[in-house]
Amino acid sequence: MTNWQLKLADKTTKIQVQTGSSQQLLTAWPQLEGRKILILTDSQVAPLYLQRLVQQLAAVSQVFTQIVAAGESSKKLANVEICYQQLIENHFTRQDYLLCLGGGMVGDLGALVASTFMRGLHLIQLPTTIVAQSDSSIGGKTAIDYHDVKNLIGTFYPAEAVLVDPELLLTLPQRELAAGLAEVIKSLLISEQQPEDQQLLAQITPDELTKTALLARLVTRGLQIKSQLAQVDFYDFKERRYLNFGHTIGHAVEALAAGQLHHGEAVSIGMVTMMRALVAHQQLPTSVLTQTQQLLSSLNLPIEIPQQFTHQQIMTKLMTDKKANDVGIQLVLLHDIGQPYLQTMTFTDFKQWLGW
């Protein structure tokens, strides 16, 4: 078991990584006893874990559930309103809890609801995907998509506890597990290397991904990197933006794919696209690109922009990116592994820099 506390602004988040902890929630967070709890989950996760969770908590708490359709399209204002209605009808107060059981979509949606209902409910994250377990469940960002713009409406609201059970990852399809690992690989690329990081990267193979011990180490390392960056830059003005490496192109490709690509697959494409341009401009060692491409390809992750998307379509999508401004767009670039930096380019300069 690994435990630590993350202090962000005026809030403290307890982070716990422990195999099997999802079956011992009251041990991990006894404050749930005697409170009303709304469990928010999606249609994919609910059949796997919802009943087990309700049975644990119903003996000592009033438990309510809200299931939304699986997928990014559920991260919308209509579902925020549905959750509000549940909370109002069941007379929730600020002393009660919203528990997010799911991946990044559920975590983002639920955290936004918790942050805005009565100006703040207690929030617990129980992430079930590798992206959520290693990254999105901590740091306090909440969001929904609006008018086809990703994460346009949101707040900063750290959870009181993030309870990570790597065992939950074993039910993920291989494709989804690999896509999630793209985010862990990204974190290892932008972080100052620790002695164990190269060993971790070497162990990321399809055959090893069924082992909870390795999954626990990977999500723990991802959370440690995210914790360090969020602590020095909670409101996302500088260092925390390093976590967006690969996301500029990635978000555009993901939006154009309209659900045909997982988020991590789009990030994989985005990272390689940026690294190829950096190598072409002699701003990144070729060996870093080669190692990254080989690792991503070994997991069957895409590294090429789908042929049906034109460069102009991608550039048009970039104009609605949150990192865009009147000058252009802020990019996350790499000098080398563990040496990220920010640079703003005009859209014209960026297109030329990419060789498009």
Question: Which residues fall in each region the model found?
Answer:
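ATP/NTP phosphate-donor binding region
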Residues: 1-96
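C-terminal charged capping/lid subdomain of soluble metabolic enzymes
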Residues: 2-4, 290-356
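A glycine/threonine-rich phosphate-anchoring loop and its flanking beta-alpha core
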Residues: 9, 112-204
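Glycine-rich beta-strand-to-loop/alpha-helix junction loops that act as flexible
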Residues: 70-71, 101-103, 245-246
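Catalytic-loop motifs flanking and including active-site residues across diverse enzymes
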Residues: 79, 177, 267-270
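Short glycine/serine/threonine-rich phosphate/pyrophosphate-binding segments
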Residues: 105-112, 133, 252
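Active-site segments that bind and position negatively charged phosphate/pyrophosphate groups
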Residues: 206-309
